[in-house]
Amino acid sequence: VASSAVVASREVFRLFLIKPSHYDDDGYVIQWVQSEIPSNTMAVLNGLALDCIERKVLGDNVDIEIIAQDETNTRIRPKNIIRAIGEGGSKGLVALVGVQSNQFPRAMDIARPLRAAGVQVCIGGFHVSGCMSMLPELPADIREAQDIGISIFAGEAEGRLDEVLKDAYNSELKPVYNYMPDLPGMEGVPTPVLATPNIKRNIGNRTSFDSGRGCPFQCSFCTIINVQGRKSRYRTADDIERVLRENLDQGVTNFFITDDNFARNRNWEAIFDRIIKFREENNADIKLIIQVDTLCHNIPNFIEKAGRAGVNRVFIGLENINPD
């Protein structure tokens, strides 16, 4: 007697990673054919989501499909998202990522029609993380988001994305995921990476990564420490080489290092040395944008090694100007 096996049909879970833009003074969404600065948050979450796919966190029978869209260079059409998530009985989650305070109104305008159609939505980024960290009670805009069923994610997603995806797959998203008291380490975690079509929407085929987060200083005007903490956390030189190699494999050699002050990353020299070695061994024309303070030229070897590593643009922060 011939035996027959029942093969379970595969499920699809669609994960939309959307970086909202913001409105100009006339109420129009600011958008470009190609944008200048790529979203590091989207690259981080895309890398974490790829790791979730590799580890099959939703089970062997579920295919996770990632759709990453940066609204500064891509039109976001909620109707298309609603159609895609509902197609063929698939499930999904829309994650509005890296949302800053001036982007929160736009994030809400994207989210409202999605929630009205029953699509699961989660918002994370500096606005919700900073408000939960600094304010005694949530402001009205975040409360409104919760009222229409939007999940709030405060903190960083390393080691936490599994939980959110599993909850969304089971249609059991929590109202709040608050990881602010427990910020993760950065060593050995999945690297930030974007797919080639996303990178080509940035001028110069540029992508981004962060080599460190947090700061030990307690400047009164700084919001970074209220979100990323007062303990500095770093990627290793091995981590950075992995970022470079994964991107070089898809022809990308142009990077923005998003640390607010790369010169104060205690691993700066090891990172520059590794990038210099990588450039020479792979004949790779690595180009870097970094952010530093006005005193970085006093750090021995910093300027010389920055040049050899491929730094060709620098943002210099003027935190305080003494009129005298």
Q: Where are these predicted regions, by residue range?
A:
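Accessible peptide chain termini
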Residues: 1-3, 324
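Acidic, low-complexity intrinsically disordered segments
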Residues: 3-250
